[in-house]
Amino acid sequence: MKSYHHLHETRSLRMHRIVEERYRETPDDVIRFGLENLERWQQRGVDCDDFRIWEEILRFVPQRLPEILSGSSEEAVRLRQSSPFAGLIPEAFRQQILTTSL
């Protein structure tokens, strides 16, 4: 039986691979989407160190996105837990990913 943590990471990785595909198709749109989410969260008073790291990546080194979105490093796994791409994947498709990851 898979642990909850392993299942959560598997689902997260699958969703972020879709974000990576979108990034390869329309990088500016994906970057803008992530920055807008970060800005909105900051305006609501939601903040954490990883959000600042995401902002740096999106603004200054977006070429790192593929490694973060689908990589297996500790940093990639950690950053995906605070991803600024919430809402990028349509809800119906997201639900399909969640149910097929069981």
Describe the predicted segments one by one:
Residues 1-102:
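Basic, alpha-helical nucleic-acid-binding regions used in initiation and control of genome expression
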